[in-house]
């Protein structure tokens, strides 16, 4: 059985490692985090590369993409020689370009894919997949939760930068990390109102402060509901302007409430070692998300938020 050392998988020392994604934040964070971890072992400079799909390819499964990088459009980076020794790809739209890069470099570029590629794993030198995907293969390494670029150093820097901003908020300080609807979960206006009401009751019962951030998936209507209902004393609601305080929330908060739709945010909150509670949304039954949450609860990493 091979160890976790990349040399045991046939990898050579690297000068350059490309972190290749379609530009979505969740994909970038995973590719960056995995590429940085590889660089610490194998050497090399991490360079982030974007291959942003143009219409109509952005709406189609990765298998329908044209060959190589011909489906990449506005916002994409230049993809050409000199080629890297290692490509870390993440997301379905990065698979075709990663395989094309390896072919252009006559097999001298190794591909490490983060997440379940939903295609033949033999195309990659290594696949690092999450346990709830239940993926198997000779070149598959399984991890619990998603990979990310959060480190002790980045949290320390964020704490130093932002600590004065939240000094007036009471302790304990609870960070609320809210995503939104996806293919599995629905975050309706009614669910959002109930969520905000539960947060306020929890705040009153525990005399705590709240740090709240939402995402693009939250949607405008839900975002406005949260903003209006949570405009209360001892609540910091990030409105999206200026620098993103997300890592500061991770560094400074004493506990976390995270909406069920985001494996990434749950995994990043768990990295801190602080209590993490999951905010339920409509949906999820019988899906890989449900498997993920069961695994995390069974391992003692998370609990379900019940309103207090």
What role is predicted for each listed range?
Residues 13-18:
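Extreme N-terminal starter segment of soluble prokaryotic enzymes
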Residues 19-20, 24-142, 148:
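Active-site and donor-binding regions of nucleotide-sugar-utilizing enzymes
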Residues 24-27, 246-289:
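A donor-sugar binding/catalytic signature common to diverse glycosyltransferases
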Residues 48-50, 128-129, 209-216, 280:
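Short internal beta-strands
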Residues 121-188, 305-308:
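A nucleotide-sugar donor-handling region in carbohydrate enzymes
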Residues 181-214:
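Conserved catalytic-core segment of nucleotide-activated headgroup transferases in glycan assembly
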Residues 207-242:
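Catalytic donor nucleotide-activated moiety binding site of glycosyltransferases and closely related
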Residues 293-308:
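Leloir-type glycosyltransferase catalytic cores
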């Amino acid at each position: 059985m091979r160890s976790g050392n990349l040399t045991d998988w046939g990898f050579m020392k690297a000068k350059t490692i490309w972190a290749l994604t379609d530009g979505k934040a969740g994909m970038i964070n995973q590719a960056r985090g995995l590429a940085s971890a590889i660089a610490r072992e194998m050497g090399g400079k991490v360079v982030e590369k974007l291959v942003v799909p143009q219409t109509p390819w952005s709406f189609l499964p990765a298998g329908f993409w044209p060959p190589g990088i011909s489906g990449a459009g506005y916002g994409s980076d230049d993809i050409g020689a000199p080629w890297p020794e290692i490509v870390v790809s993440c997301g379905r739209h990065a698979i075709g370009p990663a395989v094309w890069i390896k072919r252009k470099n006559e097999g001298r570029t190794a591909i490490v894919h983060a997440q379940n590629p939903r295609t033949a794993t033999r195309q990659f030198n290594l696949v690092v997949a999450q346990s709830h995907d239940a993926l198997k293969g000779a070149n598959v390494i399984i991890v619990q939760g998603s990979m990310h670029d959060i480190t002790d150093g980045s949290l320390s820097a964020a704490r130093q930068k932002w600590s004065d901003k939240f000094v007036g908020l009471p302790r304990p300080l609870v960070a609320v990390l809210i995503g939104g609807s996806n293919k599995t979960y629905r975050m309706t206006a009614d669910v959002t109102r109930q969520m905000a009401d539960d947060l306020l009751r929890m705040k009153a019962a525990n005399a705590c402060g709240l740090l709240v951030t939402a995402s693009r998936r939250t949607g405008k209507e839900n975002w406005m509901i949260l903003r209006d209902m949570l405009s209360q004393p001892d609540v910091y609601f990030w409105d999206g302007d200026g620098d993103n305080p997300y890592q500061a929330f991770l560094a400074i908060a004493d506990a976390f409430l995270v909406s069920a739709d985001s494996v990434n945010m749950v995994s990043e909150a768990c990295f801190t070692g602080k209590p993490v509670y999951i905010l339920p949304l409509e949906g999820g039954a019988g899906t890989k998300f449900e498997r993920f949450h069961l695994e995390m609860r069974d391992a003692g990493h998370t609990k379900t938020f019940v309103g207090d």
